[in-house]
Amino acid sequence: MKKLIYLFLILASCNSKNNDSKKLPTNFEGKVVAIKDGDTYKIMCDGKERTIRLSHIDCPEKSQPFGKNAKHFASYLCFGQIAKVVSEGKTDRYKRLIAEVYVNDICVNKELVKNGFAWHFIKYSDNEEYADLEKQARQNIVGLWTDVEPIAPWEWRKK
């Protein structure tokens, strides 16, 4: 019995080391090599492509009004640039690292909301700065807020 317990402890410690080595770094820099849509990017770091899902925001879907605009605006801001990725290490159900992305000290996430290419994703974020940026974009009637009745992406996906 003691041998089984000892064997279990050894295997458990080996397994935890393997899990730790697979974790993504929470903060890193890399080159933006693809813009999948307004809020999902691929960033090359240390020879590995990492998929990033922007935190605090939700951009229109590609098939949705302003979806292509959000992607083009994101491309303009950061495609081909060196980006700093800041994350708490959380991933979404698609295993994308959830993070803020900075290019030239500008937060891409905030710029998308500020310019009306994203909603503050209140289901997953209670950040007041993002709420204020969305409120300002609505008041300034920019981007998707020029639409008479913009549909939030989480509602669009229900269709």
What residues fall within each predicted segment?
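Small beta-barrel nucleic-acid-binding modules, primarily SNase/OB-fold domains
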Residues: 2, 8-159
